[in-house]
From Swiss-Prot:
A GO term for molecular function: tumor necrosis factor receptor activity
Glycosylated residues (UniProt): 118
Sites bearing Phosphothreonine, chain numbering: 211, 318
Modified residues annotated as Phosphoserine in this record: 221
Subunit structure: Component of the death-induced signaling complex (DISC) composed of cell surface receptor FAS/CD95, adapter protein FADD and the CASP8 protease; recruitment of CASP8 to the complex is required for processing of CASP8 into the p18 and p10 subunits. Interacts directly (via DED domain) with NOL3 (via CARD domain); inhibits death-inducing signaling complex (DISC) assembly by inhibiting the increase in FAS-FADD binding induced by FAS activation. Binds DAXX. Interacts with HIPK3. Part of a complex containing HIPK3 and FADD. Binds RIPK1 and FAIM2. Interacts with BABAM2 and FEM1B.
PROSITE patterns (UniProt xref): DEATH_DOMAIN, TNFR_NGFR_1, TNFR_NGFR_2
Residues anchoring lipid (S-palmitoyl cysteine): 196
Organism: Macaca nemestrina (Pig-tailed macaque)
SUPFAM superfamilies: DEATH domain (SSF47986), TNF receptor-like (SSF57586)
GO cellular component, one term: external side of plasma membrane
Protein name: Tumor necrosis factor receptor superfamily member 6
Lineage: Eukaryota, Metazoa, Chordata, Craniata, Vertebrata
Location in the cell: Cell membrane; Membrane raft
GO annotation, biological process: activation-induced cell death of T cells; extrinsic apoptotic signaling pathway in absence of ligand; immune response; motor neuron apoptotic process; necroptotic signaling pathway; negative regulation of apoptotic process; regulation of stress-activated MAPK cascade
Amino acid sequence: MLGIWTLLPLVLTYVVRLLSKCVNAQVTDISSKGFELRKIVTTIETQNLEGLHHEGQFCRNPCPPGERKARDCTVNEDEPDCVPCQEGKEYTDKGHFSSKCRRCRLCDEGHGLEVEINCTRTQNTKCRCKPNFFCNSAVCEHCDPCTKCKHGIIEECTLTSNTKCKEEDSRSDLPWLCLLLLLIPPIVYVVIKKACRKHRKENQGPHESTTLNPETAINLSDVDLSKYITTIAGAMTLSQVKDFVRKNGVSEAKIDEIKNDNVQDTAEQKVQLLRNWYQLHGKKDACDTLIKGLKTADLCTLAEKIHAVILKDITSDTENSNFGNEVQNLV
């Protein structure tokens, strides 16, 4: 009895090992069958393009190019019922089992494309670049505009390559550059000559630039400016008057004094400043000093204006004097 109880664990261990081997064998067999099933399905999927397609039932052959399947096969290895694709809008270019045709490609003009070959039931639309556009990629989804050359063309633009342009050649500008260098010296000479002539004309004395009789020319340098001070002051700005008198002997202290005495009246400041200068300078050559001083300060227009006023007045006085003398001679 004791021996039986001793052998029982050994028997149970053997049974467990035997059952384990059986289970492993079954699992291995199931895995092997699963692999074989996947292999069969893969083979069937591959054969879809070769003549068999499983969709409900197996169809023996695909629909030819330009057609699509109208309905599923009802019997294994039956012939499919195929109908044509819509001409000009759809196509299929190889045998297939699909119930749909492919949509024809559109050639987008906005991307530089145009139709080369129209779409048929068995062939998709073929696009190409429009004139003056190119595409250098294998599949053209868009075309780029050809480059426009400024300095000449090496190679014209084609459907597959851009224009090759000549680079700007500095030597082409050489003749123009030489011509410009030849023209510069005479142009500079003419400009300088005119500037010198203008400068000489501006620096001429009042009696040199205007044709006067000898008597008027002599008296112009000694003309009494006191009666013209107000007119001259009215033609000048305060800063111009200050600048002139400062350069011609009037001290800063005197300028400040006149300013403080006439703080609210700039017109009176100008008159008093010019009177003070005239008193310091004296009558002799005062007119010439005033005219030349204004021209030196680049106030030629103002100098000519003042000179014209004085000259007109002197000429009028001279004519009146001559008229009086003629009357006396007649008497």
